[in-house]
């Protein structure tokens, strides 16, 4: 109904979980797996280890909410502690979904200090809270670099540049470096936020979520 439309929510996740003789692996990406998006630039992260179980649990919640049978997924989850494939590393992975994505982005930006650098590549950027956090980080002496899609095209149709042109104007007015992807009909479809501190430590947030409300 029209009354339900304001609460409409699509499943925007792009997740692949596979298994082989070495165990389970996961891919989280910004890419839509269809030919209409084949020219778009995207990003993805492939990983193993306990985080695969966290990802499966988040997908199981969606299945349960939809009334689907979760028996097969439950069996996979029960075997993951022994079967999850991981690479020995000091890196850590955390799976975040829904509003936790905004909270994590806000934390990454908000805790950046003078001498740190924030690199943001985003298909859609318009969330007021995050725009304010970016401007405040710049004022604290954080180097902020932003790469945006110009929002000119979508599947062969011309667009008006909303929302990125308005956001870029605001950020540029605050003194933040904003650059446009050099697209020719395709989309700069990546969604990533990278923070590097003065010691070379890095914190990366990526996936399918745009920074919009």
Model-derived features: where do they sit?
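Active-site cores of enzymes that catalyze phosphoryl transfer or operate on phosphate-rich substrates
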Residues: 47-50, 61-104
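PLD/PLD-like phosphodiesterase catalytic module centered on the HKD motif
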Residues: 1-23, 35-40, 46-53, 57-64, ...
